[in-house]
Amino acid sequence: MSKYSDAKELAGLTLGKKTEYANQYDASLLQPVPRSLNRDDLELGDSLPFLGHDIWTLYELSWLNSKGLPQVAVGEVYIPATSANLIESKSFKLYLNSYNQTRFATWEEVTERLTQDLSACAGEAVLVEVNPVNHYTNQPIVTMEGECIDDQDIEITSYDFNAALLEGAAGDEQVEEILHSHLLKSNCLITNQPDWGSVEIRYQGAKLDREKLLRYLVSFREHNEFHEQCVERIFTDLMKYCQPTKLTVFARYTRRGGLDINPYRSTEQDKPAHNNRMARQ
């Protein structure tokens, strides 16, 4: 369990509790989670060591137009890593469901309402795109860049999170490379439900021992944290134990409740070059 799973800030969340589904617009359904909960544990101060965003894809976004005809769209939301709060995912789902039987005059009105509400919950301006389904007709299914480190003939007997598995992972050779793994799995901080993801690590610096890196990533398998928190933990652990001069950690998680979350943290830029989905998304 996480060190802060019993924090008072989490006590009022609807996550893990039986809830009613509203179908009329209700911004009060959104619930923030202070980023400081895990950042204090990681000993991160006000000056963050990374840039980044949490990129959400909204696959179940629907409302009624002014004549009552249902509209459907796919939303993309970019929440800055500098925001005071992340947005709890079940509350996000319930909030989106509240649009289902609500009339809006234009698509622009929906975008503006989403932007206003999500920014208020996050505590910082959020970027929202609302796109018609055919916007994605020719979008490719992609994989992560670089080399996959998963095909290693190693034995693993422990699945308890252990950052010290990265000790000695930095070699003597200086490289610039991209590695990825599809074996990232952690558990929801509140419900203990599994969260499945892939993670891409782009870095410049001492060459990483791929066996040590894979063992470290697998150690998240029984770890309880939200997606965004896991990615920040990976970033800070790599910085601590391996000290690269450049580092980007980008995870893409499978969707739940019509939402997927793709946290991006980097020393170089605040967003990835694209937001194309992967096979498991």
UniProtKB/Swiss-Prot annotation:
The gene is queF. GO terms for biological process: queuosine biosynthetic process; tRNA modification. Pfam families: QueF, QueF_N. InterPro entries: GTP-CH-I_C/QueF (IPR043133), NADPH_dep_7-cyano-7-deazaG_red (IPR050084), QueF (IPR029500), QueF_N (IPR029139), QueF_type2 (IPR016428). Homodimer. Keywords: Cytoplasm, NADP, Oxidoreductase, Queuosine biosynthesis. One of its GO terms (molecular function) is preQ1 synthase activity. Residues 261-281 are annotated as: Disordered. Its main location: cytoplasm. This is NADPH-dependent 7-cyano-7-deazaguanine reductase. It is found in: Cytoplasm. Substrate binds at I87, E88, S89, H227, E228. Catalyzes the NADPH-dependent reduction of 7-cyano-7-deazaguanine (preQ0) to 7-aminomethyl-7-deazaguanine (preQ1). It catalyses: 7-aminomethyl-7-carbaguanine + 2 NADP(+) = 7-cyano-7-deazaguanine + 2 NADPH + 3 H(+). Transmembrane segments: none annotated. Pathway: tRNA modification; tRNA-queuosine biosynthesis. Disulfide bonds: none annotated. NADPH binds at S89, K90, R256, G257. Its EC number is 1.7.1.13. Belongs to the GTP cyclohydrolase I family. QueF type 2 subfamily. It comes from Vibrio campbellii (strain ATCC BAA-1116). The keyword Transmembrane does not apply.
